[in-house]
Amino acid sequence: VDKVSFLQEKSAFHMKYPEQSDLSFYRWFTQQHPDEAIGWYHLGQAREAQGDTRQALAAYRQSLFAKQGPYYDEARDAYQKLLREQSRQGWRNRARLLLASLAFLYAQFVFSPGPLQDGAPAASAQPQAVPASAPAPVQPHVEVIAVPATLSPKELQSQVRRYVEARRPALAQPYTVLVVPEVPGSPLFTPLLFYQPKQVLGVLQYNPVSRTVISQRWFGSPASFDAGATLAAARGDLAVEQQTLQHVLTLRNSLYRYYQQKGTLPASLADLAGSYPGNYLPQVPLPPKRLLLKSYPYHPHAFQSGSAWASLRDVLPLPGYPEPLSPLAPLQVRLSQKSHTLQLVSGTHLVRSYPAAIGKNDSTPEGYYTILQKINQPRGHDNIYGTRGLVFQGNGYAIHGTNHPESIGTSVSLGCVRLFNAAVEELYTFVSLGTEFIISNAPVPAQPWSNPALFILPAGPEEETPNVIYTWLH
């Protein structure tokens, strides 16, 4: 339904029911067209105008689970804005309570008997100077692309040559292309940023400045990527580039979610690695040694609220490598109940794919959620929750590990989502508070995917809740 059709339906509704309000129309429209974001957005606007924040958030959330269309982006912005306002209101209430307590204590102190002595004058607070660091040296760039299985050797080499010759002019250094067999469900001739090759059909090094092939080798049949000296350099270069991309994506997503919830960026990256319940990240990742950086550069002054995500490229730049041609996007967790698969995605990029156990009898709730809490070593009888927990709904629903790994891939829980412990530890590393989680019953086929080496940042005792025994719907 486009905007014109929506307005026409609204006009027809009021002509037929002149005594009904706009709110009545929006409620009627969402019942007739539950998959259209435009109706849920306007219903949310009407609820918000009435001051009914809970109903407004529910409507905005439903619009984000609808198909993309008119007002989808507006609904997303309104949803996040209302969440931020709720968070700020909570802080204001707590601040008022704190100020009242301080005022009472001050009055007790001022009017109490006894001599008072002036203390030493307090030093004025000054912002910490961040030492400037040299940019990271340019690193060997590697791209992994999948190609159709039907190409002859001659066609394959010709099409890969056309691929490298058509690359963006921003690439000014020689780079390597790893050609892998077709990955079902993934695009062809498109960089697969977070795919770990098992087999390769060929490797080519290209100079985009002189537009010449520096070296190339083609295998008559798929060759193992993990063996042989020929691919040793490419293996090492790809591993470091993927590690750097993962670090930067994790940090940018955490900064973005922090801004969505608090309306500002943290003073330093270290503020992201707080204690529970403010633990956006378990730790701040350190750059790979070959980048020659002590820490990732952070420039919060470069942030622009009008283009929050896009400006994070300047706030936290990708050191040593070109930005991906298909831009990175905020991380999102998606669960397909039909295929028992949980995926971590960044826009068009599949970052990770894990098999999952879900609720029996459709007890895992379909819908749009956000990560509310992250708990290290969640307590439960017999270690039923494994090593990590990510709560996405306040009444007992979480993504967690398991002490029954044989259950993964089945419908056996009371509603929670189970992962292997190593998988939930990696997801816990990637995913910050506020990250979106979408659960769908749509029949999405399982996509075979080869994850890179595990990316796990150790979680400390400050992220544990030792005095809480959880009763999640495991």
Language-model regions, residue ranges each:
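Exported/periplasmic cell-wall-interacting domains
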Residues: 221-223, 260, 381-474
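Extracellular/periplasmic head regions of type IV pilus-like filament subunits
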Residues: 129-239, 260-330
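Gly/Pro-biased beta-strand-loop elements
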Residues: 311-407, 469-474
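Structural register within alpha-helical repeat arrays
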Residues: 9-10, 43
